[in-house]
């Protein structure tokens, strides 16, 4: 794939707890320069990023989409809190929501609870908003990844996503992406996120079935693809 093609698959990400407004603005400026598909920020930075996307574009359309994380990073917020967090993020300008499931439900194989939680968040935002569901796949065997993906699909998600990037168990893996592709490939998007810092690893994820990449080192990764 060419650099520009890969760039459109990237969610350029800044989720550090101490990220400043200045750093978010720098992220957005870099996103516009690189031609990425979206930025991914904390709910408190959505308004700033959404305003920046139009300042970064010379056209009527925004330069990139704005994604907000929800229930991040542990997924243990009450569902009503996640739904309200999603509503407020959309009101501030987010067009994509990356929600963390209650990961214990995936370990306990409580698929109905996962589906219900996702459905409630899905219903809390307009249909045009893209909902991505973070599974924290490093904690799950393949069978649980597959079942969680199917619960996400039943709940109305548009994407499943590997990882928050914050859990010590690890981030995206080829194993997890392949399991996700087995479960919902061709029907839902698959976002690989967490620990992808080289073009080689990005290529591995795309070959395994990823259709979106969550990256903080976007410039370094893109430099490894042909112009």
From Swiss-Prot:
KW Amino-acid biosynthesis (keyword) present: no
Pathway: Carbohydrate degradation; 2-deoxy-D-ribose 1-phosphate degradation; D-glyceraldehyde 3-phosphate and acetaldehyde from 2-deoxy-alpha-D-ribose 1-phosphate: step 2/2
Enzyme nomenclature, EC number: 4.1.2.4
Gene Ontology biological-process entries: 2-deoxyribose 1-phosphate catabolic process; carbohydrate catabolic process; deoxyribonucleotide catabolic process
Source species taxonomy: Bacteria, Bacillati, Actinomycetota, Actinomycetes, Frankiales
HAMAP family cross-referenced by the UniProt entry: DeoC_type1
Subcellular location per the Swiss-Prot or TrEMBL entry: Cytoplasm
Signal peptide region: none
Reactions listed under catalytic activity: 2-deoxy-D-ribose 5-phosphate = D-glyceraldehyde 3-phosphate + acetaldehyde
Statement: the UniProt record of this protein carries the keyword Transferase: no
Major place of residence: cytoplasm
Keyword tags: Cytoplasm, Lyase, Schiff base
Pfam family, one: DeoC
GO annotations of cellular component type: cytoplasm
Family: Belongs to the DeoC/FbaB aldolase family. DeoC type 1 subfamily.
An example molecular function term from Gene Ontology annotations: deoxyribose-phosphate aldolase activity
EC top class named in words: lyase
Protein's recorded name: Deoxyribose-phosphate aldolase
Gene that this polypeptide is encoded by: deoC
InterPro entries linked to this entry: Aldolase_TIM (IPR013785), DeoC (IPR011343), DeoC/FbaB/LacD_aldolase (IPR002915), DeoC_typeI (IPR028581)
CDD domains: DeoC
């Amino acid at each position: 794939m060419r650099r520009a093609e890969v760039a459109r698959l990237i969610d350029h990400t800044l989720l550090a707890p101490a990220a400043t407004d200045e750093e978010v603005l720098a992220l957005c400026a870099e996103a516009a320069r690189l031609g990425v598909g979206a930025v991914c920020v904390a709910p408190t930075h959505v308004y700033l990023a959404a305003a920046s996307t139009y300042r970064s574009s010379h056209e009527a359309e925004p330069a990139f989409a704005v994604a907000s994380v929800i229930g991040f990073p542990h997924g243990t917020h009450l569902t009503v809190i996640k739904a309200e967090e999603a509503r407020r993020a959309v009101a501030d300008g987010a067009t994509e929501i990356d929600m963390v499931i209650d990961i214990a439900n995936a370990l306990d194989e409580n698929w109905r609870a996962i589906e219900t939680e996702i459905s409630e968040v899905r219903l809390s935002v307009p249909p045009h908003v893209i909902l991505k569901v973070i599974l924290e796949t490093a904690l799950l065997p393949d069978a649980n990844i597959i079942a969680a993906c199917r619960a996400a699909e039943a709940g109305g998600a548009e994407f499943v996503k590997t990882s928050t990037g914050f859990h010590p168990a690890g981030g995206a893996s080829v194993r997890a992406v392949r399991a996700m592709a087995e479960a919902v490939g061709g029907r839902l998007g698959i976002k690989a996120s967490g620990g992808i810092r080289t073009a080689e690893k990005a290529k591995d994820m795309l070959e395994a079935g990823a259709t979106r990449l969550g990256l903080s080192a976007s410039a370094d990764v893109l430099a490894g693809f042909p112009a």
